[in-house]
Structures are given as structure tokens and as C-alpha cells.
A protein has these predicted regions:
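S-adenosyl-L-methionine
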Residues: 96-142
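Short glycine-dipeptide loop
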Residues: 169, 174-181
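C-terminal catalytic and target-recognition region of SAM-dependent MTase-like enzymes
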Residues: 178-237
Length: 237
């Protein structure tokens, strides 16, 4: 074990390290990610998302046409880089300037500095509302919404209240021939069955396609089990 995170009953916590550098890199295929630990437990990457990167990467490659992807609450850009490396043009939106800078550094480390990626520091809800007014459309939408957050101008996000209306909003910027819609959840109240219900209600009932929702996790080498890490809901034509 290289490090252990100790939670505090006052919120947050502290890392205890064992022969671990302050920063390091990790590779997934051709993608390179810069990692460092933070007091809120994150290290800059959710590796369990690799199963989703593989899924939508194949869909983008097999589309045999230009694909525009919108990545919302995009964090340090794992999904952005996976989509761009598969050939998509990507719009990356996150409310944190620091996270967008980190994502750009990951793109540079992955040799994707010149990839067609648009980097935006913005409130995701307000951005989608503006895209509706502009008439912009996307073939794929990916989102990894936090349980709670604030936009760059103090906008409050509470996932239990906001997520279903936000999915409804996002369906208005899907293209006439959409390819995929992915939503990830690390919130206890948004389990696979809930994600499936929302995607079936807002997408399948209106434009067809199919939905798959399941838990995602990381394999544990010491016991052969899978450590649950969250849930994903996928829609595809």
C-alpha cells in the first residue's frame, strides 16, 4: 500500500503516504494522466471510468462520421481525452478553472494538445441553456455531475434536485442522429435503477435506442473481487 486516506468527522480528511511522490503519472493505453492527492480524497482520476472510455471510444470510432461530444462536469478530462483520441471533437466544460488547467496538462502529456478540444470554464447548466439558444447540437453527451457543487459565480448544484431536469435540458442539444448519452453517479441516491429510469423516460420514450445501467468498480488483485465505485447509465441508438 502506497497511501491511506483518513476521513475527518469534521469533513475532508488527510492522506498518509508510504513511499509515494507528491505527483506522479499513470497511463491508460495512449492516455497519460498527471495525479496528485487532495484533502477531499481525489487524486485527479477515477480509473473505474475506463470501462466507459472503452465503450464510447469504440462507438465513436465505428461511427464512420464526424462526431461532436459534450463533456459536462468534465473534471481533469479523462472522458475528454478518451473521446478525442477516438476521433471526436470535444467540448470540455467544468466550473473549476484549476480542473480545466489540469485537464489541458493531461491532454499535453497524452499528445493531444492539437486535438479538436474546446476548453471552457463555465456553469454546466447555464452553458447548456446558452447552447439551446444558439442552436448548437452534439452527437454525444457525457456527464459526471457532483453530489453538490458551486458554479464559477456561486451557482448552487444539488444533484437530487437538479439532475432529472438537467437531463431533460440536455436532450434539447442532441443532434438528429445522436450516438450516445452517458451519466455517471457517485451519489448514494442515484443507483443504476434510477439512472435507467431517467434515461428511459427522457431518451428511449422519445427517440428510441436502448439503456444499460450498472455499477462500476475496480478489480482487487488480492482477492479477485470488484470494489464498487459508483454507477453509470448509458444510452445508445
Amino acid at each position: 500500500m502506497n497511501g491511506h486516506y483518513h476521513r475527518s468527522n469534521k469533513g475532508g480528511g488527510e492522506w498518509e503516504f508510504f513511499n509515494l511522490p507528491n505527483t506522479w503519472q499513470i497511463n491508460y493505453g495512449k492516455l497519460v494522466f498527471n495525479l496528485q492527492p487532495f484533502k477531499f480524497k481525489h487524486t485527479g482520476l477515477f480509473p473505474e471510468q475506463a470501462v466507459n472510455w472503452d465503450w464510447f471510444g469504440e462507438k465513436i470510432k465505428n461511427a464512420k462520421r464526424p462526431v461532436k461530444v459534450l463533456n459536462l462536469f468534465a473534471y481533469t478530462g479523462g472522458a475528454t481525452l478518451a473521446a478525442a483520441s477516438a476521433g471526436a471533437s470535444v467540448t470540455h466544460v467544468d466550473a473549476s478553472k484549476g480542473m480545466v488547467t489540469w485537464a489541458k496538462e493531461n491532454a499535453a502529456a497524452s499528445g493531444l494538445s492539437d486535438a479538436p478540444i474546446r476548453w471552457l470554464v463555465d456553469d454546466c447548466v447555464k452553458f447548456v441553456e446558452r447552447e439551446i439558444r444558439r442552436g448548437n447540437k452534439y452527437d454525444g453527451i457525457i456527464m459526471d455531475p457532483p453530489s453538490y457543487g458551486r458554479g464559477p459565480k456561486g451557482e448552487i448544484w444539488k444533484i437530487e434536485e437538479k439532475i432529472h431536469p438537467f437531463i431533460q435540458l440536455c436532450t434539447q442539444i442532441l443532434s438528429d442522429d445522436p450516438l450516445l448519452f452517458l451519466i455517471n453517479s457517485y451519489t448514494t441516491g442515484l443507483q443504476p435503477a434510477v439512472l435507467s429510469y431517467m434515461l428511459n423516460t427522457e431518451l428511449v420514450k422519445k427517440i428510441g435506442g436502448k439503456v444499460e445501467a450498472e455499477e462500476i468498480g475496480l478489480p482487487v488483485s488480492s482477492n479477485g473481487l470488484v470494489l464498487p465505485c459508483g454507477a453509470s447509465g448509458r444510452w445508445e441508438k
